[in-house]
Amino acid sequence: MKILVTGGAGFIGSNIVDELIDKKHKVVIVDNLATGNIKNVNKKAKFYKVSVCDKKKIDDIFKKEKIDIVIHHAAQLDVRKSVADPCFDADVNIKGALNILEACKNTKVKKIIFSSSGGTIYGECGLKAPDEKAFANPLSPYGVAKLSVEHYIKAYSALYGLKYTILRYGNVYGPRQDVNGEAGVVAIFIGKMTANKDILFSVTVNS
């Protein structure tokens, strides 16, 4: 199959691309390298340096490549930035996703797999390990955007028959992760430990 991976130069996306190529799939990457790294791009994949916000270029790529499945990882990743500039966050994370969904609809893509959020979707739900049945109550524009896209995907499935899988990742860590990023506490701690640096905890105690 031919699979398009948005955000395929990023930490998670590039690892998915490598696995798909190992499984003998044809892979197309769309990434504007805002947070991705060209060094992560598998040379056996076809690479387009394009933003998901560029509707015309996205449409052209889908028409040209005849995609079977889309794995959508491209996003504005910073929760704090989403609070500081919610309009920009919505432009990338909601409108960008809609550009992908429209291209899927118009070119008869079989399925979309969406990278949602396992932390920000639930807000302060009080559960140690919320599952899919837990109440979604996002408290940041980033979380609101991710949940909104989940609903858009379900709507496109109901309206146009687009199959989907939604993955709510939480505290993902692994190869190629930026240990200096604002997210990814496991990678940050591992990075500090391997560099023999102190790990600082900020603790709030309510009595």
Tell where the protein language model's regions lie, with residue ranges.
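N-terminal Rossmann-like NAD(P)+-binding domain of SDR-like oxidoreductases, especially those catalyzing
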Residues: 1-172
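NAD(P)-dependent short-chain dehydrogenase/reductase
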Residues: 126-128, 154-207
